[in-house]
């Protein structure tokens, strides 16, 4: 819902930080792209622009594209071969961009993904005398395509149907996502450097909001958008882990360059819609990087639908603090919360004794008391929670909690319109 970004802007303005607000908005309110094109509307998009490949290395780009592939589907062999094709495509395209001083983009990768495009890129490398390390991935892939004759690489009209069909099986793994991204969200994905540099957003403590639609796109598209952002984020954090061993701390320890008084907070809302195993890996590493990861989900089952129960359990174990809100049944989510809270010894009276008197009978406590181990959180306690109420589980203690309520009147202002921070491109 668009009030999330608007509320964040007003609250940021209250603290003088509205200039730090950045937004990647994939929501379009169900508007028809065809109607917008036909009407000739030239208004600026309700979003900053983003090129996830502008400053990425080959590994970053390949991993980001791999995250677009559907998960938990049949045809794993085709996906493995598609990943190999993707790495050859990315390496060749990236080297060409570096050599020619161009900016790699989603649209450029899509153009080169065809068999003709990869063959043309290979021929360009031969003509321009690229280094062997740069041209080898393209040559190795083309040689591995069944039915492809390297002697005919410059004459596509002489190719047989078999290599085209084999390559189409591989590129087809990416075609649905690429088509959706380029056509539906083409105004967000920039062909140049774009407005948003996620590494700058993290290291400069900016407030970056990513808005992903849930109702007007397929579950796969929603998941692919979320996984792409998470992959970009995790690969950028990987840089901060460092790799240099020789030199002083100032030269080698990347994370100390950006260390502040407080960790950078990243909130992944409805994480079950785009969960990837990279999130579990992030949870094991972020503490050493001055990075705080907050994940929210309606239920555990949706996360397990994207991965295995084992990976979900690993994620839960790496979540140092857990917040449990209202639930509706005693399912896996409730059991996970109960296990996290642990048990405590409680005294229970075993019986009541009846005493007959002049005025009638009465009941008094019995003489036996039993000590039983019971969960610190009862399912009924979770079911009876109201809006804004939750339990905090921290270091084995269960703390009844309530969120801070901010009235709507203090979260907006009719006389002060929201403005997206637009940036001016400057040639380096």
Regions found by a protein language model. Name each.
Residues 1-291, 380-386, 390-400, 411, ...:
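P-loop NTPase motor domains
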Residues 7-11, 303, 337:
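Hydrophobic packing residues within well-ordered alpha-helices of enzyme cores
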Residues 298-302:
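Conserved H-loop
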């Amino acid at each position: 819902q668009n009030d999330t970004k608007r509320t964040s802007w007003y609250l940021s303005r209250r603290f003088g930080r509205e200039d730090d607000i950045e937004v990647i908005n994939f929501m379009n309110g169900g508007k028809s792209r065809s109607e917008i094109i036909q009407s000739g509307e030239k208004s600026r998009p309700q979003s900053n622009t983003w090129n996830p490949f502008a400053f990425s290395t080959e590994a970053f780009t390949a991993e980001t594209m791999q995250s677009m592939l559907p998960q938990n589907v049949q045809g794993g062999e085709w996906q493995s071969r598609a990943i190999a094709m993707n790495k050859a495509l990315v390496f060749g395209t990236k080297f060409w961009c570096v050599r020619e001083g161009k900016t790699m983009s989603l649209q450029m990768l899509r153009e080169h993904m065809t068999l003709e495009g990869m063959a043309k890129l290979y021929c360009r490398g031969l003509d321009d005398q690229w280094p062997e390390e740069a041209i080898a991935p393209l040559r190795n892939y083309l040689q591995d395509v069944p039915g492809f004759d390297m002697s005919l690489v410059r004459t596509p009209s002489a190719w047989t149907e078999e290599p085209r069909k084999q390559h189409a099986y591989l590129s087809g793994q990416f075609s649905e996502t690429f088509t959706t991204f380029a056509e539906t969200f083409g105004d967000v994905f920039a062909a140049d450097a774009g407005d948003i540099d996620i590494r700058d957003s993290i290291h400069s403590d900016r407030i970056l909001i990513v808005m992903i639609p849930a109702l007007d796109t397929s579950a796969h598209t929603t998941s692919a958008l979320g996984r792409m952002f998470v992959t970009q984020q995790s690969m950028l954090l990987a840089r901060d882990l460092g790799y240099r061993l020789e030199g002083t701390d100032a030269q080698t320890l990347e994370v100390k360059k950006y260390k502040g008084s407080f960790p950078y907070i990243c909130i992944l809302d409805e994480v079950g819609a785009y969960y990837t195993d990279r999130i579990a890996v992030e949870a094991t590493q972020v503490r050493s990087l001055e990075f705080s990861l907050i994940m929210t989900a309606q239920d555990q089952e949706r996360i397990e639908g994207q991965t295995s129960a084992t990976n979900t359990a690993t994620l839960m174990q790496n979540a140092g603090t857990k917040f449990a809100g209202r639930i509706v049944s005693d399912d896996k989510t409730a059991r996970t919360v109960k296990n996290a809270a642990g048990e405590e010894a409680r005294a229970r009276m075993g019986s009541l004794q009846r005493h007959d008197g002049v005025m009638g009978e009465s009941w008094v406590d019995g003489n036996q008391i039993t000590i039983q181990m019971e969960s610190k959180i009862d399912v009924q306690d979770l079911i009876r929670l109201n809006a804004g109420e939750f339990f905090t589980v921290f270091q084995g203690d269960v703390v009844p909690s309530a969120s801070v309520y901010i009235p709507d009147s203090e979260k907006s202002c009719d006389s002060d319109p929201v403005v997206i921070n637009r940036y001016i491109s400057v040639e380096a």
